[in-house]
Amino acid sequence: MSWIERIKSNITPTRKASIPEGVWTKCDSCGQVLYRAELERNLEVCPKCDHHMRMTARNRLHSLLDEGSLVELGSELEPKDELKFRDSKKYKDRLASAQKETGEKDALVVMKGTLYGMPVVAAAFEFAFMGVSMGSVVGARFVRAVEQAQEDNCPLICFSASGGARMQEALMSLMQMAKTSAALAKMQERGLPYISVLTDPTMGGVSASFAMLGDLNIAEPKALIGFAGPRVIEQTVREKLPPRFQRSEFLIEKGAIDMIVRRPEMRLKLASILAKLMNLPAPNPEAPREGVVVPPVPDQEPEA
């Protein structure tokens, strides 16, 4: 037996560790390998470079509202292929694929609940649903959110993210720009606050309508915000655009938005702003996440 064979005979093979899929992920910006559970606890913000990754609509709403207070609105509304549209694929097949992938019926999720005990209505876009395009159901759900805020006499918060209008619905999609803007005008007449939170990316018809109509327009760091994308603009004007063009830091320098807030600080910041606008006590940062719903008590005559 050669010395190599003697060494090989003394080697005990070990079983390769089985790591479940999805335990680790990589930061899109710095490339750091991150533990998935830790990243979720950090609200999808990279602990190394502070890059804000995309967050599902439901996770965003659950991270915002008090535990146990969430009630979904407009879940019965579903998209329909009224035009029988077809490009390289039937629209109804695209819808079925997006619904299966995301578990959502459409790109906007609306819930009412409480934020530090204060009643609010909140909406958030699901990025993975057909590029967060705006169709008729998105418009209908947003209007439902506005109407619920008026009914409850409470603020509305919307986390926008969109690639624009949904071309498969043609004019019915474009009509949602006017429909949502008109609904917000009625809310403004009531004097109820509407805060728009712009996330990456917020483009097209959404940015040209309700995403930029907030009483306060807040953006997450480095979010891409605009109508047409930078590549399209460069090809049109045939000029090189300035650095960070259409990013939230560029927009705040030009006065296009009101403030930039990091995601981990968003919940308390929104609650503090709304408390001032609604003339309510400032939120307690140490308060538990449980929902505290305190309905107004109407003035009543004592029973005889």
Curated annotation (Swiss-Prot):
Residues 23-292 form the CoA carboxyltransferase N-terminal domain. A zinc finger (C4-type) spans 27-49. Residues 284-304 are annotated as: Disordered. It is an enzyme of class 2 (transferase). One of its GO terms (biological process) is malonyl-CoA biosynthetic process. Its EC number is 2.1.3.15. Zn(2+) binds at residues 27, 30, 46, 49. Pfam families: Carboxyl_trans (PF01039), Zn_ribbon_ACC (PF17848). It is found in: Cytoplasm. One of its GO terms (molecular function) is zinc ion binding. Its main location: cytoplasm. Its cofactor is Zn(2+). Acetyl-CoA carboxylase is a heterohexamer composed of biotin carboxyl carrier protein (AccB), biotin carboxylase (AccC) and two subunits each of ACCase subunit alpha (AccA) and ACCase subunit beta (AccD). Component of the acetyl coenzyme A carboxylase (ACC) complex. Biotin carboxylase (BC) catalyzes the carboxylation of biotin on its carrier protein (BCCP) and then the CO(2) group is transferred by the transcarboxylase to acetyl-CoA to form malonyl-CoA. HAMAP family: AcetylCoA_CT_beta. This is Acetyl-coenzyme A carboxylase carboxyl transferase subunit beta. It comes from Shigella flexneri serotype 5b (strain 8401). The gene is accD.
